[in-house]
Amino acid sequence: MSDRNEIVSRVTAALEGKPAPVAIRNARKVDARGERRGYWVVSDAAGVIVAAGTGEETFEHYCRTVGLDPADRNAVIDAEGRILTPGYVDIHAHGAWEKSFDDGPDGIDVARAGHAVHGTTRQVLSLITNPVDVICRNIRTVRATMESGRPDILGCHLEGPFLALARKGAHDPECLKDPVPDIVDKMLEASGADPA
């Protein structure tokens, strides 16, 4: 568990911190066009990819343009031939590593780290059916986490409470509601949206 806690701390710090230049070399790029070996990518201090390709001289040039020493093993990541793909975007997951996105800020940090280490760079956090006040609290927590500067969190997906009893699956029937304006307005207010 201590390894997992260390990963959570590192991932959370990286996501909350200021972007820094990053360079990755010696990767296998895999995308819709196929696979390329010896691939590299360089991003600047704003987190924007400035160049990508193959060829050592060009890699070194772009490293220097963003202030990285291409020989610095602490600044340049050697992918050692591992696959480099665009980051995954997950639009429906409830958590990871024994934590739910309904478990407050710490639960969000742990679950996001669990997804991030497997390549999910952005995520819509799915929240389960609960009493309306709990759902609203969870929406506010997701909103506050996003507003704290977490670019990896795109918003939240509510899996209820507006479900038909006949199709409720594992959802608590006591928490199911009709989508009446009062409840919808409360949820919109919790999200920061104007219910008008």
What are these regions (language model features)?
Residues T145-R150, M187:
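Alpha-helix-loop-beta-strand connector modules within alpha/beta enzyme cores
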Residues D3-A23, K29-T85:
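Histidine-rich, glycine-flanked metal-binding segment
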Residues R82-P105:
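Di-metal (Zn2+ and/or Mg2+/Mn2+) metal-binding site signature of metallo-dependent hydrolases
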Residues I24-R25, L158:
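Extended beta-sheet lipid-handling architectures
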Residues A79-E80, I108-A113, I183-M187:
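Short, charged beta->alpha transition segments
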Residues K177-A196:
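Histidine/acidic residue-rich metal-binding segments in metalloenzymes
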Residues A166-L176:
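Glycine-rich phosphate-binding loop of ATP-grasp-fold ATP-dependent ligases
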Residues H94, D109-T141, P151-L165, S191-A196:
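Divalent metal-dependent hydrolysis catalytic cores, especially in the metallo-beta-lactamase
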